[in-house]
Amino acid sequence: MYLRFSLMGFKLKEQFYFHLGELIKFNSVNASALKGKPFGEQIDLCLDKVLEIAKDIGFKVYKDRDGYYGFADIGQGDELIGILAHIDIVDAGNVSNWHSNPFKLEFRDGKVYARGVLDDKGPLMAVLYAFKLLALEGIFFKKRFRVIFGTDEETAWRCIEKYKIREEIPDFSFTPDGDFPVVNAEKGLLQFDVISDERFCMNFELGTGYNVIPDECSFELGDSNKDDFRILLDSFGSKIRYKFFESNVLIHGTSAHASLPELGVNVAPYALNIIKSLGVKANFINFFEDKIGFTINGEKLFGRALEDSQSGQLTLCLTKVKLSKTSKQILSFDMRYPVSCQREELVALIKQTLNLYALDYHEVSFLDPLYVDSGSNFIESLIEVYENFTGESDVSPIAIGGATYSRAFKNCVAFGPLFKDSDNTAHKTNEYIDESELMNLISIYKNAIKKLNA
């Protein structure tokens, strides 16, 4: 990696990890609203804690009157530069599959493990400590900087929508929630349900969120022959793992962010294949087998793999399944589509296909694609910081499938935290970040803030 110098003494490093641990301990998954706590108790407590930490560092802090967001200001001047990060996390899933407590920092083999340590609490704390180090150096902030703490990034972005109504929009912004060197293009996001009114013979659920590749499901054995079940599971190959218990079988894949399905092993297609093998007949199963199957690029649904040079190939994943004896059957999908595609045209094609199977389409959420001119002074400044830090040259912005806060404001891009050789463990079981990379983040964000302050 690129660690050029010892950025912090032992005491500051100790403080950094203490403060990061103070955020990690909150299971800040979106939950039922309470008065003044629109996304639940844990997110609200985490927001209070990060504001407390920012205040101790020297920021002037503010919490939205309804609890939707908070921010921390430092500096003066007319221009406002924003840094957007989020304190909410995706569900840790079955914690017994973690090697350590997901809500406590675990240091092992040069890595730091915890839910949110990469996405996005670790990078957020790196930003705050970048400001702390600059303040210790005595730098004068002649521009206004605002670190905005989002609370609903992993679900519906209601926090940022509320912010945009009530607060000043930064002139330029970056979010530490993507990749280096700079992300100036993000695929469009479409999350939707395929719904069937068919009666079904069993209750079955898998998946925790639209943007998480599901890595676990369970089947009750009932009168099924265990040997026959084992033969079927073995026919799937070594990508999945399974374990028999007295009355059920537990099947494991590999979790991943839904924007990067190739990094995971999705148990959902295997589950529907198993259900069909049990003799179950249903239109939604036929649809999935005919138009999705084990593909991740939508080519069976749209007739070809859709892609462009700016942002790459479309991805389409089944991320949740909810089957019921007493209500409707629901298949939930996450789709990331190229910046050159039109969402309305894709939706029309999906609906047209679903009609053939007597299935209904329900749109859950969408985000339009992002594309920011790579020649802007702001992007060039961030590229320069990256090149100076890494020693690389002739670096160009990149595109990703993830949906970051870059789409929230005009002139906003993602800047880290992933380097080109980083392991992307976001949304995975045993999420981690290399300790050296975490220290590198403090360095590079410190340099970027200093450059933007010039």
Regions found by a protein language model. Name each.
Residues 2-85, 89-93, 330-332, 346, ...:
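N-terminal helical capping/dimerization or prosegment-like subdomains
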Residues 12-15, 19-26, 49-57, 133, ...:
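Generic non-transmembrane alpha-helical segments
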Residues 154, 160-338:
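Midchain, well-structured core segments that form catalytic/ion-binding scaffolds
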Residues 80-149, 155, 429-440:
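Active-site metal-coordination/substrate-binding segment of hydrolases
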Residues 259-325, 336-341, 345-348, 360-454:
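An extended, acidic, His-containing surface patch that forms the Zn2+-binding/catalytic region
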Residues 61-65, 242-244, 318, 398:
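Short beta-strand
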